[in-house]
């Protein structure tokens, strides 16, 4: 049944909001942070030598991208993993301790020093995920964070300020720093913070106390003041914000946060979509304008009245709306393609049958999830497009922000000291909730805590990679 309901005469979508969003970024993101978090301590700073502080329109053009040696070692240790272990992935700062390194792992300065070595005489981008807001991940449990809902001052003084101080070191001024700002946070305020079946008490709290907004504004302001830092705000994905009833309010929310509490639109290089999620860059076999026997594909259960069927069309349309709302015309979009390839034997090779609109869409779509609101350790997923600079109009890069092989969340309750709860969306036996239209989760079994290494998933991602691995 399409997860659609009417609120004050406006048609809304349950899945649109929390589902994929609530979790996908959050939890998948979160965990990613969780695992790589500690060591991935950090960052992207500015590098020594080179053209110090010369800002460019797209930091990825003409530059190498930092390969995190800690992720690379895990990937290379897997059978067949050396085929991708040299790919650049983001470093997740998912807790205060990650700044200096967790459990003996690399901290922020360690990553920046390594980045200077990788840079050589050319240009290099270091990708850093800022992910430690108060009351983090309010619509999911797999990647809850260390800071309570009211710990905004701690977030500023013990998290953002130390990161900004390190990134400001002249030693790193020649590096290009791409920062992904707080996955899931602002989209959760739009769809899960009151008045919808997907709302959670935690998101209502974070909307009412304003600390997500204050935190993101502060991060934009402090990091945006550093000449070689390029801030990209997380903007959910098409299966979360692709409905008009969500996209318009999301753009307004982004504009509000980028122009308050000291932040300016000049602090924003762009936005990122599909962070730690599984939505394809492009659906090659069908378009949103297709019809079957006079019925638009938007009426199918899969599309569920969404305006988009894939991430690139969503990102390009959102970019236009953001510029119209006052953001600079030079902003660019990033798309996380780390796990959205959907290759392998189950990948359709052409359009589905025209027997019904549902048969057509289900037979056409390369996204083989049970529901677009499913975000945790998805069965059948594969590595997506390899990181690429300027692949399409308005798109700064395809990036691997979520490091492949890091779990989105545990498939059963696991005691831990990382603050990570058990989210039933990671349980393959769970029947679902409002955020995924009450469908099965499609999650892989035997998954470890968010961010921890999940060998079985890594092997599946390689097996189902698209383009295939050679």
Question: What are the language-model segments listed below?
Answer:
Residues 64-67, 90-94, 125-130, 177-182, ...:
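Structural recognition of the beta-strand scaffold that forms the well-ordered cores
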Residues 5, 10-53:
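Ser/Thr/Gly/Pro-rich low-complexity, disordered linker/stalk segments of secreted
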Residues 93-100, 201-208, 235-242, 295-309:
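Surface-exposed cleft-lining segments at the edges of enzyme active sites
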């Amino acid at each position: 049944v399409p997860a659609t309901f009417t609120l004050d005469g406006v048609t809304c979508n349950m899945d649109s909001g929390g589902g994929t969003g609530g979790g996908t970024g959050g939890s998948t993101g979160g965990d990613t942070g969780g695992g790589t978090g500690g060591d991935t301590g950090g960052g992207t700073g500015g590098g020594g030598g080179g053209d110090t502080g010369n800002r460019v329109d797209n930091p990825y053009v003409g530059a190498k991208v930092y390969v995190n040696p800690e992720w690379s070692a895990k990937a290379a240790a897997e059978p067949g993993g050396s085929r991708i272990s040299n790919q650049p992935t983001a470093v997740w700062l998912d807790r205060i301790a990650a700044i200096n390194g967790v459990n003996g792992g690399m901290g922020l300065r360690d990553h920046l020093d390594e980045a200077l070595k990788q840079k050589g005489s050319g240009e290099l981008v270091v990708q850093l995920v800022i992910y430690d807001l108060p009351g983090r991940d309010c619509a999911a449990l797999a990647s809850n964070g260390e800071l309570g809902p009211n710990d905004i001052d701690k977030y500023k003084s013990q998290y953002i300020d130390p990161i900004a101080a390190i990134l400001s070191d002249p030693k790193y001024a020649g590096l290009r720093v791409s920062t992904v700002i707080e996955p899931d946070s602002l989209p959760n305020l739009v769809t899960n913070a009151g008045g919808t079946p997907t709302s959670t008490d935690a998101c209502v709290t974070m909307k009412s106390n304003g600390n997500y907004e204050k935190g993101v504004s502060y991060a934009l302001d402090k990091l945006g003041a550093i000449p070689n830092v390029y801030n990209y705000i997380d903007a959910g994905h098409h299966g979360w914000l692709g409905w008009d009833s969500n996209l318009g309010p999301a753009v307004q929310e982004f504009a509000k946060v980028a122009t308050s509490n000291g932040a300016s639109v000049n602090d924003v290089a762009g936005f990122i979509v599909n962070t730690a999620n599984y939505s394809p860059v492009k659906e090659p076999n069908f378009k949103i304008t297709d019809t079957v026997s006079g019925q638009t594909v938007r009426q199918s259960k899969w599309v569920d009245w969404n305006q988009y069927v894939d991430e690139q069309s969503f990102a390009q349309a959102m970019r236009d709306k953001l510029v119209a709302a006052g953001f600079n015309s030079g902003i660019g979009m990033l798309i996380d393609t780390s796990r959205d390839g959907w290759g392998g034997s189950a990948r359709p090779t052409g359009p589905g049958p025209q027997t019904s609109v549902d048969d057509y869409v289900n037979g056409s779509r390369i996204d083989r999830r049970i529901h677009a609101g499913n975000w945790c350790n998805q069965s059948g997923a594969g590595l997506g497009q390899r990181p690429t600079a300027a692949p399409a109009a308005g798109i700064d890069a395809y990036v691997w922000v979520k490091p492949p092989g890091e779990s989105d969340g545990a498939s059963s309750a696991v005691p831990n000291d990382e603050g990570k709860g058990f989210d039933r969306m990671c349980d393959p036996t769970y029947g679902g909730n409002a955020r995924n239209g009450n469908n099965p989760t499609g999650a892989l079994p035997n998954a470890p805590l968010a961010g921890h290494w999940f060998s079985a998933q890594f092997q599946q991602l390689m097996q189902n990679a698209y383009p295939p691995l050679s």
